[in-house]
């Protein structure tokens, strides 16, 4: 069992060329039981440090930094920052891991990637945990996220950056100062400013390009495609919803349970979008679903 993750890289392809995707790996590298944990839109694979540490006795846990984030390379063409490209990258990652099946833990965008992959014929996804995300996303929450996505923010100190991240992550719920630091330390990176070293965000600001190009027609078509993928999923699905979530509405969860094949749900109290799975009660949800423990 690893006390800390191993960092690996895999070469992926897009229409604009090759790019390296980083992944953080926990547990026995020979373990055939693999859990892939995929993060949210502006986050990194290090979001899963706590839950990966808890599960790596049973699983080889692999937490990628999706293209344009964290230790991964930025795409040459910002129009590639879309779910189909991310699904393609994950197929490459799973091939690198040399396994036929994986379980999937996807938070927000990571859940959309998981749905896209799990809904394919002959999918490698065995079980799918969707953390506060579904085929239908509340427009007001998407607008809230879009308001800060890609802004050229800079901070004079690391602590100033942490304070900003805590503010925009308030919907994560209550955390101790130590937990906030652990969650957000990887989101900041040192950058050269006009007056010396400053701190910026880890991700490519061009992530906002396809996000801001979206039209009502494109959003409707995307939602319909996600429902088709979701309804095609053959394996068990657990939908985890933050009770105060503004992104995944309670009625959407009910619709997912009704329209999916093997779908169950659980609601996490006192949390919005999205549960961070650093609290023991939240962490316990994952092994109960994946292993029955």
From Swiss-Prot:
User: Which Pfam family, any one of them, does this sequence belong to?
Assistant: Abhydrolase_6
The entry lists its GO molecular-function terms as:
hydrolase activity
Q: What is this protein called?
A: 3-hydroxybutyrate-oligomer hydrolase
Q: What Gene3D superfamilies does the entry give? A: alpha/beta hydrolase
Q: Which reaction does it catalyse?
A: (3R)-hydroxybutanoate pentamer + H2O = (3R)-hydroxybutanoate tetramer + (R)-3-hydroxybutanoate + H(+); (3R)-hydroxybutanoate tetramer + H2O = (3R)-hydroxybutanoate trimer + (R)-3-hydroxybutanoate + H(+); (3R)-hydroxybutanoate trimer + H2O = (3R)-hydroxybutanoate dimer + (R)-3-hydroxybutanoate + H(+); (3R)-hydroxybutanoate dimer + H2O = 2 (R)-3-hydroxybutanoate + H(+)
Where does the record place it?
Answer: Cytoplasm
The record's function comment reads: Catalyzes the degradation of various 3-hydroxybutyrate (3HB) oligomers at a high specific activity and artificial amorphous poly(3-hydroxybutyrate) (PHB) at a lower specific activity. Hydrolyzes the 3HB pentamer most efficiently than the tetramer, trimer and dimer. Does not hydrolyze native PHB granules and semicrystalline PHB. Participates in the mobilization of PHB along with other hydrolases.
Q: Which UniProt keywords apply?
A: Cytoplasm, Hydrolase
Outcome of gene disruption: Deletion of this gene enhances the deposition of PHB in the logarithmic phase in nutrient-rich medium.
Report the top EC class in one word: hydrolase
Q: Name one GO cellular component term.
A: cytoplasm
Tell me yes or no: is tRNA-binding among this UniProt entry's keywords: no
Native source species = Cupriavidus necator (strain ATCC 17699 / DSM 428 / KCTC 22496 / NCIMB 10442 / H16 / Stanier 337)
Instruction: Supply the EC number(s).
Output: 3.1.1.-
Q: What induces it?
A: Seems to be expressed constitutively both in the N-rich medium (cell growth conditions) and in the MSF medium (PHB accumulation conditions).
Record flagged with keyword rRNA-binding: no
**Note from the entry:** Poly(3-hydroxybutyrate) (PHB), a homopolymer of (R)-3-hydroxybutyrate, is a storage material produced by some bacteria, that is used as sources of carbon and energy.
Which gene codes for it? Answer: phaZc
> Can you tell me which family this protein belongs to?
Belongs to the AB hydrolase superfamily.
Q: Which PANTHER family match?
A: HYDROLASE, PUTATIVE (AFU_ORTHOLOGUE AFUA_2G14860)-RELATED, MONOACYLGLYCEROL LIPASE
- Principal localisation: cytoplasm
């Amino acid at each position: 069992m690893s006390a800390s993750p191993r960092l690996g890289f895999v070469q992926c392809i897009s229409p604009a060329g090759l790019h390296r995707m980083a992944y953080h790996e926990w547990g026995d590298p020979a373990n055939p039981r693999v859990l892939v944990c995929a993060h949210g839109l502006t986050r990194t694979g290090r979001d899963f440090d706590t839950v990966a540490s808890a599960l790596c006795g049973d699983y080889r846990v692999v937490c990628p930094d999706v293209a344009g984030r964290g230790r991964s390379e930025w795409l040459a063409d910002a129009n590639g920052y879309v779910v189909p490209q991310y699904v393609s990258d994950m197929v490459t990652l799973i091939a690198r891991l040399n396994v036929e099946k994986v379980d999937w833990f996807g938070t927000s965008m990571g859940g959309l990637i998981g749905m896209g992959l799990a809904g394919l014929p002959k999918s490698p996804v065995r079980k799918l945990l969707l953390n506060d995300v579904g085929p239908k996303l509340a427009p007001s929450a998407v607008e809230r996220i879009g308001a800060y996505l890609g802004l050229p923010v800079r901070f004079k100190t690391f602590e100033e950056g942490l304070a900003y991240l805590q503010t925009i992550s308030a919907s994560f719920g209550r955390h101790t100062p130590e937990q906030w630091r652990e969650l957000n330390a990887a989101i900041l990176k040192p950058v050269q400013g006009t007056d010396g070293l400053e701190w910026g965000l880890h991700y490519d600001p061009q992530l906002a390009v396809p996000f801001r190009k979206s039209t009502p027609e494109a959003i409707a078509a995307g939602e319909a495609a996600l429902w088709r993928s979701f309804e095609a999923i053959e394996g068990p699905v657990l939908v985890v919803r933050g009770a105060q979530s503004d992104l995944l509405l309670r009625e959407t969860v009910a619709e997912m349970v009704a329209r999916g094949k093997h779908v169950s749900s659980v609601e996490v109290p006192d949390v919005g979008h999205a549960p961070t799975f650093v609290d023991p009660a939240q962490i316990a949800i994952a092994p109960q679903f994946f292993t029955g423990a």
